[in-house]
Swiss-Prot record:
Cofactors named for this entry: [4Fe-4S] cluster
Gene: nifH1
Family: Belongs to the NifH/BchL/ChlL family.
Name of the protein: Nitrogenase iron protein 1
Keywords on record: 4Fe-4S, ADP-ribosylation, ATP-binding, Iron, Iron-sulfur, Metal-binding, Nitrogen fixation, Nucleotide-binding, Oxidoreductase
Length: 284
């Protein structure tokens, strides 16, 4: 399997990040910006068991996940009409879903869902942008599928100037490096979803430098993101003229035009610790 086998002309991107970092919010607003401002044909495939990767694009409508339909109705019931929905600006939306709590492996669900979508030819040939929104706390076999099997050409990691977010980002970089030769996958850059901690921009610049990549965009914190989510919309749909919409527009443009893809140089735990101590995140 290579990334040329699905949606051959699309820019195929996987967005990784630890749970709660704002990865799905970032993915949906980026996808919405590409569709709204640049008239791109976009699809999001959510690879997070929370199945919230497309919620705002679909205005909060419940999404039948591939794994839910498979478990409850059987393989024959998994059709594009049932599991692939159309949202804001005709963005196509699919959620892998996961197992029942306490039973089975969510990573395995990602593998199954992607395989079924390929069989159903669920990734249209005329896509401009295809996003995989992937849980990044653990880069296990299933969640590493976009890396390992070359589903995505380039990976972007959402992080912030906080210890555990940086730890997860560094681990994801290790996963990218592991599969770089096998699948051709590369790191496109780091997206900082700002938490407004002291020295955050400087910390992110140095973190990117250590990984051998670049800060693709520093997304400032803004309460309009929560207001839009409360109204079950992306910021782009809620208020396309606001400052935060312009930030997401810039992020979308930076990703779409980026061709500086690298094999990352992950830090050792000692190096990461030194970095966060330098910026006062932890005391030793």
């Amino acid at each position: 399997m290579s990334f040329d086998e699905i949606a051959p002309d699309a820019k195929k991107v996987a967005i990784y990040g630890k749970g709660g970092i704002g990865k799905s919010t970032t993915t949906q607003n980026t996808a919405a910006a590409l569709a709204y401002f640049f008239d791109k044909k976009v699809m999001i495939h959510g690879c997070d068991p929370k199945a919230d990767s497309t919620r705002m694009i679909l205005h909060g409508k419940p999404q039948d996940t591939v794994m839910d339909v498979l478990r409850e109705e059987g393989e024959e019931a998994v059709t594009l009409e049932k599991v692939r929905k159309i949202g804001f600006k005709d963005i196509l939306c699919v959620e892998s879903g996961g197992p029942e709590p306490g039973v089975g492996c969510a990573g395995r669900g990602v593998i199954t869902a992607v395989d079924m979508m390929r069989e159903l030819e669920g990734y249209p040939d005329d896509l401009d942008n295809l996003f995989f929104d992937v849980l990044g706390d653990v880069v296990c076999g299933g969640f590493a599928m976009p890396l390992r099997d070359g589903l995505a050409q380039e990976i972007y990691i959402v992080t912030s100037g906080e210890m555990m977010a940086l730890y997860a980002a560094n681990n994801i970089a290790k996963g990218i490096l592991k599969y770089a030769e096998q699948s051709g996958v590369r790191l496109g850059g780091i997206i900082c979803n700002a938490r407004n901690v002291d020295g955050e921009k400087e910390l992110m610049d140095e973190f990117c430098d250590k990984l051998g990549t670049k800060l693709i965009h520093y997304v400032p914190r803004d309460n309009i993101v929560q207001k839009a989510e409360f109204n079950k919309m992306t910021v782009i749909e809620f208020d396309p003229e606001c400052n935060q919409a312009k930030e997401y527009r810039t992020l979308a443009k930076n990703i779409d035009e980026n061709d500086e893809l690298v094999k990352p140089t992950p830090m050792t735990m000692d190096e990461l610790e030194e970095l966060v101590v330098k910026y006062g995140l932890i005391d030793l």
